[in-house]
């Protein structure tokens, strides 16, 4: 039976971890929002929006993070004149417990939602799963997003800012920002393809402990 099934199902893999797309999805749009510190860096001119205040007019950093998530998805959709009905699935997350910023944003966006908690891998994971959905014929367009906020991450992982702890100039700093890409089956887009960016394959990572 296994041999029969293997002959029926086309294998779109290379090795144990890499999947190959027979109809490579296209990246048709993207949008970004970042905080003031990120805007001062070398990539500052390339971001769609740089906030002047990392609370963005909200009364908590968590609400600002939720706002970044929602605004970035809507921004990517607006660039290619997509309404909510034109996106089949939203994939993404943040760094907080129960990916609360992403969940509250998804409530407002009213899109079918797959919440992901991959920390720094969330963007790559959302693109990988999203493009697999497209190549498999389960979705025509997907929105893939990751967001984080320095101040919420400090509370979650390190030292809440209210403690007033000092850090060294070389200390790690979690990004305040959000980035969204919209991937699509290129046969749906026609002249709307805004570049030659396609996802042709993806490699699924694995947890490795070298015992160090």
Report each predicted region and the residues it spans:
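Condensing-enzyme catalytic core mediating Claisen C-C bond formation in acyl metabolism
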Residues: 2-62, 160-212
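Solvent-exposed alpha-helices and their adjacent loops that cap or buttress functional pockets
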Residues: 16-20, 82-83, 105-108, 122, ...
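Conserved beta-ketoacyl condensing-enzyme motif
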Residues: 27, 61-120
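Short beta-strand segments
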Residues: 28, 92-93, 142-148
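A glycine- and small-aliphatic-rich helix-loop capping segment at beta-alpha/alpha-beta transitions
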Residues: 42-46, 102-112, 134-136, 157-166
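Secondary-structure boundary elements
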Residues: 78-83, 132-141, 184-193
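Short, well-ordered, mixed-charge alpha-helical segments that flank or form enzyme active sites
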Residues: 99-100, 150-155, 206-210
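Active-site-proximal alpha-helical scaffold in enzymes
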Residues: 117-144, 183
């Amino acid at each position: 039976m296994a041999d029969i099934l293997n002959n029926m199902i086309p294998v779109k893999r290379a090795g144990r971890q890499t999947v190959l797309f027979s109809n490579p999805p296209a990246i048709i749009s993207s949008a970004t929002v970042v905080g003031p510190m990120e805007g001062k860096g070398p990539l500052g001119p390339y971001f769609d929006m740089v906030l002047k205040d990392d609370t963005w007019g909200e009364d908590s950093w968590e609400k600002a993070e939720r706002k970044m998530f929602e605004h970035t998805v809507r921004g990517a959709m607006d660039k290619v004149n997509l309404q909510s009905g034109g996106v089949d699935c939203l994939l993404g997350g943040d760094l907080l417990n129960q990916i609360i910023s992403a969940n509250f944003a998804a409530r407002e966006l009213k899109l079918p939602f797959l919440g992901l908690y991959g920390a720094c891998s969330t963007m790559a994971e959302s693109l990988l799963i999203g493009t697999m959905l497209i190549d498999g014929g389960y979705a025509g367009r997907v929105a893939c997003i990751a967001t984080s906020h320095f101040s919420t991450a400090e509370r979650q992982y390190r030292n809440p800012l209210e403690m007033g702890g000092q850090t060294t100039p070389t200390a790690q700093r979690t990004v305040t920002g959000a980035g969204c890409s919209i991937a699509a089956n290129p046969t749906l887009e026609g002249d709307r393809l805004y570049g030659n960016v396609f996802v042709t394959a993806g490699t699924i990572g694995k947890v490795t402990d070298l015992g160090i």
